[in-house]
From Swiss-Prot:
It holds the Pfam family SHCBP_N. This is Testicular spindle-associated protein SHCBP1L. GO terms for biological process: cell differentiation; male meiosis cytokinesis; positive regulation of chromosome organization; spermatogenesis. It comes from Homo sapiens. GO terms for cellular component: cytoplasm; meiotic spindle. Testis-specific spindle-associated factor that plays a role in spermatogenesis. In association with HSPA2, participates in the maintenance of spindle integrity during meiosis in male germ cells. Residues 299-326 form a coiled coil. The keyword Glycosyltransferase does not apply. InterPro entries: Beta_helix, Carb-bd_sugar_hydrolysis-dom, PbH1, Pectin_lyas_fold, Pectin_lyase_fold/virulence, SHCBP1-like. The gene is SHCBP1L.
Length: 653
């Protein structure tokens, strides 16, 4: 637990790379994003004191008894909880020797130039300059040669060795020690074989500097001695203030880190691939789509977690196999197969992400596996009242022959619904996992002001409201998205109506998938990370008297890459859209964007320009009019204003 302010560190701060392809040699390192995050402003990395138990090191008297705890600052020590106090009782805190000076703060490392590269620059760097026409099985050798050529520029330089805390400590709080950083002097020597290609010789530089103020100098010396002063090269980050050659080396290291972090897959050299650089380009495009928001943040998080889980599972399997001394027992063989098939499953998911045709929408498979119930056997419909207590006042507007059923929560009400039923919700705040499983034709409506009937998503779930019912209607409600990764509302098939609703998005907006239909009237959509309403090829939507605003709230360094805003249409086959009396404003992309493949765009554009346009500035308007005709897009009396990129635009892909 840190005593000072905590640095912001991503959840995937540590990675496991396998530079020898099949994972025979694996090394842990801190991700490039973490390194950049700590030095982006060009200041020294904050130094802090922590509580941790040093790892016992062999070969020196007294090391086995060196399991003392590093002393924390007194102020933070006074804030210990009962749990921490119990831990301290088991193993008392021992102070660092008084004559031992605290480590100095680490100097800033070279800021990553990779972060500022455009998509085309990254593709050119990896495909044309580094990998060229190499095959997947040769990628390791090519990356090694590229790095060794750059390292010839300078044989000695200063860097920060950033490694997993487990190298130094057996006990530590992960939140307080994201990595252990030590200022070292690096000596570059030509590698003798493939196993030493990603290793480098280091020694502690003066003055002794670390991100952990009270780490003992002796402990660092002992760890390095045990490692024979050889550490993974990709764990070393050159520091600022050296000559220009160091910046070339720093970029080369970042290029190789990014390759193993994001572009390399362990299965690459196990499968035939005619054009490996084309595959690398596709992965670069995937990464850029995540960064610029084409793939919304919450959905991108799913991919990152899947990739991280795949890497971890692969390392687990390698470690498990290496611990089997002789012929495996039946139980060990079963466990190996279990771990192997987990890896195969994750591998399949990652391949789906890399295929543009398969990653059209988040999870790649239907979200609803529940079958339709249909109507009740006796043919009657029931009105479900959702309220903790029910009074006669609540049902005074219902006819005397209405069959009623009262429920304490919305989930239970939805679980008891059959086609034709109505769910009435009174003011309050609700959650319902069953909203993501709408298969029957029901009406869900609030009674009272729509702002007072709040339905929030469960952050632990992927989806919020998902429907494949033939005809489902939501009325007079507020849907508030919290943490779910899919669209706030996803219409998989059938028809959904949203009437007088407020949709406060946190992930993507309303998604209408191929073949589905949506009608939205008198509603408000705001806060989506992508478009407020997204129409997939072959879908149908009618929007009337709605407000769609402040969508495409993406944190991206390249805002010009993100065009989505109020309404986005994906064509081929063309969706159908009718918009009447809507107000679309203050979106960061366009008010309405039409996403059309490049070849089809030029066909339509050429026809529009040759046949419909007269001259001058009218060409763009005529072309847009022609495209809108071809797309079956009808727009009447809409107010589209104050959108950052413009009102309406054809975007090519």
């Amino acid at each position: 637990m840190a005593s000072g302010s905590k640095a912001s560190v991503p959840a995937d701060s540590f990675r496991t790379i396998s530079p020898d392809r099949r994972g025979e040699k694996s090394a842990s390192a801190v991700s490039g994003d973490t390194a950049a995050a700590t030095t982006l402003k060009g200041t020294a990395i904050p130094v802090r004191s922590v509580v941790a138990s040093p790892r016992p090191v062999k070969g020196k008297a007294g090391r086995e008894t060196a399991r003392l705890r590093l002393q924390r600052l007194p102020a933070a020590q006074a804030e210990d909880t009962g749990e921490a106090a119990a831990a301290a009782a088991e193993e008392p805190l021992l102070p660092v020797p008084e004559d031992e000076e605290e480590a100095q703060p680490l100097p800033p490392v070279c800021v990553s130039r990779m972060r500022g590269m455009w998509r085309d620059e990254k593709v050119s760097l990896y495909c044309d300059e580094v990998l060229q026409d190499c095959k997947a099985e040769d990628a390791d050798e090519v990356m090694g040669k590229y790095l060794s050529e750059k390292l010839k520029l300078k044989d000695k330089w200063l860097g920060v060795w950033k490694t997993n805390p487990s190298v130094f400590f057996v006990k530590y709080e992960e939140a307080s020690i994201p990595f252990v950083g030590i200022l070292v002097e690096v000596t570059c020597e030509p590698y003798q074989d493939s196993s030493s290609r990603f290793k480098v010789t280091v020694s502690v530089a003066e003055p002794f500097s670390s991100n952990i103020a009270n780490i003992p100098r002796d402990l660092v010396d002992e760890i390095l001695e045990e490692l024979e002063h050889s550490v993974p090269l990709l764990e070393v980050y050159p520091v600022e203030g050296q000559d220009t050659d160091i910046h070339v080396i720093a970029l080369a290291l970042e290029v190789v880190r990014f390759f193993y972090d994001f572009l390399w897959r362990d299965w690459d050299d196990e499968e035939s691939c005619e054009n490996y650089t084309a595959l690398i380009e596709e992965r670069i495009n995937l990464w850029c789509d995540i960064q610029d928001g084409t793939i919304p943040g919450p959905i991108a998080q799913r991919f990152k977690k899947t990739l991280e889980k795949y890497k971890n599972k692969r390392v687990e399997l390698i470690e498990y196999q290496s611990n089997i001394k002789e012929d495996p027992s039946a139980a060990e063989a079963v466990e190996c197969w279990k771990k192997y098939y987990e890896i195969v499953m994750l591998c399949g998911l990652l391949k789906m992400w890399e295929d543009l045709r398969l990653r059209v929408h988040g999870p790649f498979f239907p979200r609803i596996l529940r079958r339709r119930k249909g109507k009740r056997e006796f043919g009657k419909t029931i009105t479900h009242i959702v309220a903790k207590m029910m009074t006669t006042e609540m049902i005074k507007d219902l006819s005397s022959d209405t069959l009623l059923q009262q429920h304490g929560d919305l989930d239970l009400a939805l679980d008891n619904c059959y086609s034709g039923d109505t769910v009435i919700i009174f003011p309050g705040e609700y959650q319902a996992a069953n909203l993501a499983l709408l298969t029957d034709d029901i009406i869900i409506k609030g009674v009272g002001k729509r702002e007072e009937i709040m339905i929030t998503s469960e952050p632990s779930r992927d989806s919020f409201v998902v429907s494949k019912a033939d005809n489902v209607k939501l009325m007079h409600l507020s849907l508030i998205q919290q943490g779910t990764v899919d669209g706030i509302v996803v219409v998989e098939s059938g028809h959904m109506t949203l009437e007088n609703c407020i949709l406060k998005c946190e992930g993507t907006g309303v998604c209408v998938l191929t073949g589905a239909a949506l009608t939205i009237t008198d509603s408000e959509i705001t806060g989506a990370q992508g478009a407020g309403v997204e129409l997939y090829p072959g879908s149908i939507a009618i929007l009337e008297r709605n407000e769609i605003h402040h969508c495409n709230n993406l944190r991206t360094s390249n805002s010009s890459k993100s065009t989505l805003g109020g309404v986005n249409m994906k064509v081929l086959p063309a969706p159908k859209l009718k918009m009447t009396n809507n107000h679309i404003y203050s979106n960061k992309g366009y008010g309405v964007s039409i996403l059309q493949p490049m070849e089809q765009f030029f066909i339509v554009a050429e026809e529009a320009l040759n046949k419909r346009a007269s001259s001058g500035d009218k060409k763009d308007d005529k072309m847009l009019f022609k495209v809108m005709q071809n797309l079956n897009l009808e727009m009447n009396n809409n107010k589209i204003e104050a959108n950052v990129k413009g009102d309406i635009r054809i975007v090519t892909s």
